[in-house]
């Protein structure tokens, strides 16, 4: 029999993977269960692994697999907090352009179930780089991934967001926005020169751009140095 916290964590992992295709980070698990530290999450995961509910996948960062669920499983028991991106996974290869190259227009699809989103260049998930360029090509994404507003896509370079399930080579889908809430993953323009993909935080009157990789430090800026360019709503991943 599982404890309440063990069951909450198991269902949180299961629902997140069902929604986004990637497991939540340890920070997201900690916040979802209202725990004070990540050590409690490590203990819960070990207990779930020992009881045969999950297993850790070797040689992969933050890789978990849910093997079984409690008999009394109900989606309503699952805590829902933090970022839950939509994920498309497919074969490696350059996405084929879809005409016309306009933001969030219906692609050539009889049911208009897909839309064309422009890929605007690369974004750093690491040390900021000079970023957003002109439209290089378009990709087709499911319409229900986007919701309202204007969208664009960026190719990720770097590994600073791996604990948020965002890897080097992924394509992120961004909703145009000039504002963000604490905890949102955003495209941030620093000093009108460099763009980076980071989690948005506030530190008093300052803005913190927080990585999701312990190898990278959180960077603090004055509010006049950072402009939010959009918020992450989904990602696309390709494999060899």
Curated annotation (Swiss-Prot):
<keyword id="KW-0234">DNA repair</keyword>
<keyword id="KW-0805">Transcription regulation</keyword>
<keyword id="KW-0678">Repressor</keyword>
<dbReference type="InterPro" id="IPR006199">
    <property type="entry name" value="LexA_DNA-bd_dom"/>
</dbReference>
<dbReference type="GO" id="GO:0009432">
    <property type="term" value="P:SOS response"/>
</dbReference>
<dbReference type="InterPro" id="IPR006197">
    <property type="entry name" value="Peptidase_S24_LexA"/>
</dbReference>
<feature type="region of interest" description="Disordered">
    <location>
        <begin position="78"/>
        <end position="113"/>
    </location>
</feature>
<dbReference type="GO" id="GO:0006260">
    <property type="term" value="P:DNA replication"/>
</dbReference>
<dbReference type="Pfam" id="PF00717">
    <property type="entry name" value="Peptidase_S24"/>
</dbReference>
<dbReference type="InterPro" id="IPR036286">
    <property type="entry name" value="LexA/Signal_pep-like_sf"/>
</dbReference>
<feature type="site" description="Cleavage; by autolysis">
    <location>
        <begin position="125"/>
        <end position="126"/>
    </location>
</feature>
<dbReference type="GO" id="GO:0045892">
    <property type="term" value="P:negative regulation of DNA-templated transcription"/>
</dbReference>
<keyword id="KW-0235">DNA replication</keyword>
<dbReference type="InterPro" id="IPR039418">
    <property type="entry name" value="LexA-like"/>
</dbReference>
<comment type="subunit">
    <text>Homodimer.</text>
</comment>
<keyword id="KW-0378">Hydrolase</keyword>
<keyword id="KW-0068">Autocatalytic cleavage</keyword>
<feature type="active site" description="For autocatalytic cleavage activity">
    <location>
        <position position="198"/>
    </location>
</feature>
<feature type="active site" description="For autocatalytic cleavage activity">
    <location>
        <position position="160"/>
    </location>
</feature>
<keyword id="KW-0227">DNA damage</keyword>
<comment type="similarity">
    <text>Belongs to the peptidase S24 family.</text>
</comment>
<dbReference type="GO" id="GO:0003677">
    <property type="term" value="F:DNA binding"/>
</dbReference>
<comment type="function">
    <text>Represses a number of genes involved in the response to DNA damage (SOS response), including recA and lexA. In the presence of single-stranded DNA, RecA interacts with LexA causing an autocatalytic cleavage which disrupts the DNA-binding part of LexA, leading to derepression of the SOS regulon and eventually DNA repair.</text>
</comment>
<keyword id="KW-0238">DNA-binding</keyword>
<keyword id="KW-0742">SOS response</keyword>
<dbReference type="InterPro" id="IPR006200">
    <property type="entry name" value="LexA"/>
</dbReference>
<dbReference type="InterPro" id="IPR036390">
    <property type="entry name" value="WH_DNA-bd_sf"/>
</dbReference>
<dbReference type="Pfam" id="PF01726">
    <property type="entry name" value="LexA_DNA_bind"/>
</dbReference>
<dbReference type="InterPro" id="IPR015927">
    <property type="entry name" value="Peptidase_S24_S26A/B/C"/>
</dbReference>
<dbReference type="InterPro" id="IPR050077">
    <property type="entry name" value="LexA_repressor"/>
</dbReference>
<dbReference type="InterPro" id="IPR036388">
    <property type="entry name" value="WH-like_DNA-bd_sf"/>
</dbReference>
<dbReference type="GO" id="GO:0006281">
    <property type="term" value="P:DNA repair"/>
</dbReference>
<feature type="DNA-binding region" description="H-T-H motif">
    <location>
        <begin position="26"/>
        <end position="46"/>
    </location>
</feature>
<protein>
    <recommendedName>
        <fullName>LexA repressor</fullName>
        <ecNumber>3.4.21.88</ecNumber>
    </recommendedName>
</protein>
<dbReference type="GO" id="GO:0006508">
    <property type="term" value="P:proteolysis"/>
</dbReference>
<dbReference type="GO" id="GO:0004252">
    <property type="term" value="F:serine-type endopeptidase activity"/>
</dbReference>
<keyword id="KW-0804">Transcription</keyword>
């Amino acid at each position: 029999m599982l404890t309440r916290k063990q069951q909450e964590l198991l269902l949180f992992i299961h629902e997140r993977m069902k929604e986004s295709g990637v497991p939540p980070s340890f920070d997201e698990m900690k916040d979802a269960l209202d725990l004070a530290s990540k050590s409690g999450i490590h203990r819960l995961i070990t207990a779930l692994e020992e009881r045969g509910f999950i297993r850790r996948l070797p040689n992969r960062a933050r890789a978990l697999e849910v093997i079984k669920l409690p008999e009394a499983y109900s989606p309503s028991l699952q805590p829902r907090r933090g970022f839950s991106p939509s994920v498309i996974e497919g074969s490696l290869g350059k996405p084929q352009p879809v005409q016309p190259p306009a933001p969030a227009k219906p692609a050539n699809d009889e049911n208009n179930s897909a839309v064309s989103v422009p890929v605007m260049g690369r974004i750093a998930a690491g040390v900021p780089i000079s970023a957003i360029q002109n439209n290089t090509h378009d990709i087709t994404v499911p319409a229900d991934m986007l919701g309202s507003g204007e969208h664009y896509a960026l190719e990720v370079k770097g590994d600073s967001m791996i604990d948020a399930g965002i890897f080097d080579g992924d394509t992120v889908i961004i909703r145009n926005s000039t504002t963000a809430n604490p905890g949102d993953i955003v495209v941030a323009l620093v000093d009108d020169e460099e763009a980076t993909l980071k989690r948005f935080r506030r530190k008093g009157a300052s803005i913190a751009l927080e990585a999701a990789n312990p190898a990278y430090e959180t960077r603090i800026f004055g509010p006049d140095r950072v402009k939010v360019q959009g918020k992450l709503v989904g990602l696309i991943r390709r494999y060899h």
